Swiss-Prot record:
This is tRNA (uracil-5-)-methyltransferase homolog B. InterPro entries: Methyltranfer_dom (IPR025714), SAM-dependent_MTases_sf (IPR029063), TRM2_met (IPR045850), TRM2B_chor (IPR025823), U5_MeTrfase_fam (IPR010280). The active site is at 440 (nucleophile), 486 (proton acceptor). S-adenosyl-L-methionine binds at residues 312, 362, 412. Residues 1-14 form a transit peptide. One of its GO terms (molecular function) is rRNA (uridine-C5-)-methyltransferase activity. GO terms for biological process: tRNA processing. Its main location: mitochondrion. Pfam families: Methyltransf_31 (PF13847). The keyword Transport does not apply.
Length: 493
């Protein structure tokens, strides 16, 4: 019998190393090997065993052909690239099924009975597991890419691409990623010309903060209309404001008048930052030229996207995801919809015409401004968006609701899952009868959220409301060639 305390522990069942939380032995084909053995290693290591010629990356760099470097990077960034897309979907579907089986098993232990899950029988589950929804596009699907600056295998510090190696082993290099299946040509082109800019710049890149240097990472965002936004991060170190301005002009001239003009950027941003990652509030994005926002047409809405606003990286796949969320939510004219971790507000806005009222909550202030603009531009009048931490805003918002409208909650948190106070607020709000939980990493901290939502009432943890019941699950593939997918879960009570 499983130990529920182990499952509930942060260091427990689903936080083991590896990508999938189980071990099913040694099936014969590659896709089954990925399923069965990733628990002890990774998809990359399993694939490598099928190709003995690729040796394990060593601390001391050894001479290696370009194609081998490219394969190594592909194995890290897109571990499933060697499989057909049909085989990839099989791997992902089985992953979600195993996860849900484990979840149901542990819920049964916690309750001592099986009444915490629905009565359906599907794929060995009591909840209804739908077939995985494939991505409409499988190549070049990313609408946002982040490129690092570091030393190439030949030692050139002005190289733009993705990291390969580990800092612990001291073998990190930076490799161009134009060969990766999920990167659009436009993103690779902008990265290539940023590298050209760096190599002709008199200012050194910032590889490690304590080593000095200035030029840092590049972010590229695109939409389906072909518009391109680039964001360059710069560490000022000891430069004066005037010296920083000179570098901004140099960068702008390169992409407007110089070789980089071929990229045809719609907008170019500059962020001066002394931190690894920071928000617009901490260090404002400075528009060097072009449009301040990028726009996307989605589900009949014109969506505005700011430089640091969250937007699903697979636009075509996101449309399918949002339709499924809307269908599962069952929102109607009597419903109040809470869109928690709403980003630019697309989920709430897309179902607003069916709901009585929509409240969206998002941490990133720029994203909230985008959501408000999108609502106004599209004539949506029954949506309100709130900027701040969900664990602070949600309890206050629920207390302010004086009527007894049936409340539907949709949560789409980051990989870290929901804050405990948010889970507690949802659990203890007796008007919330339907919850749609969207997770891009259901085997991580989100699993803890599922347990807290469905476990028996616990006064010590202030989980006093009736437990939710897992009814349906829909895997949606937004990340072809990687082991990840979105899992949409419907809970009711």
């Amino acid at each position: 019998m499983h130990n529920p305390r182990l499952f509930l522990s942060r260091a427990g069942f689903f936080s083991k190393p590896g990508l999938l939380p189980w071990d099913t032995g040694r099936p014969p084909d590659l896709s089954q090997s990925l399923l069965g053995r990733a628990y002890k290693g990774s998809f990359t290591s399993v694939i490598a065993k099928k190709h003995p010629s690729r040796q394990k990356y060593q601390k001391k760099q050894r001479h290696c052909r370009d194609d081998s470097w490219q394969e190594r990077l592909a194995d890290v960034v897109t571990p499933l690239w060697r499989l057909s897309y049909e085989a990839q979907l099989k791997v992902k579907f089985e992953a979600q099924k195993k996860l849900l089986q484990s979840l149901e098993s542990h819920l049964k232990v916690l309750h001592g009975v099986s009444d915490t899950v629905a009565a359906h029988q599907s794929e060995g589950l009591r909840c209804l597991l739908h077939p995985i929804i494939p991505s409409p596009t499988t190549t070049g699907y990313r609408n946002k890419s982040t490129f690092s600056v570091y030393r190439s295998p030949d030692g050139n510090p002005k190289t733009v691409g993705y990291y390969l190696g580990t800092w612990k082993d001291g073998n990190v290099v930076c490799l161009p990623c134009n060969h990766l299946k999920n990167i659009p040509e436009k993103h690779s082109q902008v990265a290539q010309y940023y590298e050209v800019f760096l190599r002709q710049s008199s200012v050194e890149p910032c590889l490690l903060f304590h080593e000095g240097g200035h030029w840092r990472e590049l972010v590229v965002r695109t939409n389906r209309q072909g518009h391109t936004m680039a964001i360059v991060t710069f560490h000022p170190q000891g430069l004066s404001e005037e010296e920083v301005c000179v570098q901004k002009v140099t960068l702008k001239d390169f992409f407007t008048k110089g070789p980089g003009a071929i990229c045809e950027l719609t907008s170019l941003y500059f962020q001066e930052s002394t931190m690894t990652r920071c928000s617009h509030q901490q260090s404002p994005y400075q528009l060097l030229f072009g449009e301040p926002h990028i726009f996307e047409d989605l589900l009949g809405l014109k969506i505005r996207i700011s430089p640091d606003a969250f937007f699903q990286i697979n636009t075509a796949g996101a449309e399918m995801l949002y339709r499924i969320i809307g269908e599962l939510s069952g929102v109607n004219s009597e419903s109040l919809l809470l869109d928690i971790c709403c980003g630019t507000g697309v989920i709430g806005l897309s179902v607003a015409q069916r709901a009585s009222q929509v409240h969206g909550i998002e941490l990133v202030e720029q994203a909230v401004e985008d959501a408000r603009w999108t609502a106004a531009f599209n004539g949506v009048t029954n949506c309100e968006f709130h900027a701040g931490r969900a664990e602070t805003i949600l309890p206050q918002l629920l207390k302010s609701q004086k009527d007894e409208k049936l409340t539907v909650a949709v949560v789409n948190p980051a990989r870290a899952g929901l804050h405990y106070r948010v889970v507690r607020a949802i659990r203890n709000c007796r008007t919330i009868h339907t919850l749609v939980f969207v997770s891009c990493k259901p085997h991580g901290e989100s699993t803890r959220n599922f347990i807290e939502l469905c476990c028996p009432p616990n006064s010590a943890k202030q989980l006093l409301g009736d437990p939710f019941v897992l009814r349906e699950a829909v895997p949606v593939d937004l990340f072809p060639h990687t082991p990840h997918c979105e899992l949409v879960l419907l809970f009711t009570r």
